[in-house]
């Protein structure tokens, strides 16, 4: 993913992977959870502690439940728009003073979301959306074909 930092114009790229990590004791209904499993950061930016995004509940994050994200739309936000769309996630990211955010779902072979890509730029007003789409296709192919060998 490091190569996509330059291609997308991002300083940060995160891979958000969805899973069912626990269930309701009374009903057995599973809670949809996620982990941020990969983080690519350019050499001049500080790391965001992705450990706090382990086995986290998706329902806490408005942006991950967005209808547009579910329709596989590529979502673009300025810092202010991102904070308005999901204040909790913006707080968790530590208000890194980004200029732009892009979020895109990753789908399996059956069209079901198994994760998302989150690209963040602190320098560029515009993230290269075509490169984000190319990264999503590459990651979908890896996951849908059994992973990295």
Question: Regions from the language model: what does each represent?
Answer:
Residues 99-108:
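A short, aliphatic-rich beta-strand micro-motif
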């Amino acid at each position: 993913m490091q190569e996509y930092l330059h291609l997308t114009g991002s300083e940060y790229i995160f891979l958000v992977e969805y899973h069912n990590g626990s269930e309701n004791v009374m009903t057995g209904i599973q809670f949809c959870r996620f982990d941020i499993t990969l983080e690519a950061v350019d050499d001049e930016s500080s790391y965001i502690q992705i450990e706090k995004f382990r086995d986290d509940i998706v329902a806490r994050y408005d942006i991950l439940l967005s209808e547009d994200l579910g329709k596989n739309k590529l979502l673009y936000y300025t810092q202010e728009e991102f904070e308005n769309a999901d204040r909790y996630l913006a707080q968790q990211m530590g208000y890194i003073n980004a200029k732009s955010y892009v979020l895109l779902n990753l789908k399996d072979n059956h069209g079901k979301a198994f994760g998302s890509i989150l690209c963040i730029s602190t320098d560029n007003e515009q993230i290269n959306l075509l490169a984000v789409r190319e990264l999503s296709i590459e990651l979908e192919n890896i996951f849908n074909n059994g992973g990295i060998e």
